Amino acid sequence: MKVKPSVKKICDKCKVIRRHGRVMIICENLRHKQRQG
């Protein structure tokens, strides 16, 4: 999980979701997991 001030999709399989008011990226490739914070 990378925590970044701005999150972006890295590949076509990345999805932007919101959990508990946080923007997150989830993907099949676990290296692409990100959270805004």
Curated annotation (Swiss-Prot):
Gene Ontology BP, a term: translation
One Pfam match: Ribosomal_L36
GO molecular function, one term: structural constituent of ribosome
GO cellular component, one term: ribonucleoprotein complex
Domain of life: Bacteria
NCBIfam families, A to Z: rpmJ_bact
Membership in a protein family: Belongs to the bacterial ribosomal protein bL36 family.
Name of protein: Large ribosomal subunit protein bL36B
Organism: Kineococcus radiotolerans (strain ATCC BAA-149 / DSM 14245 / SRS30216)
Gene of this entry: rpmJ2
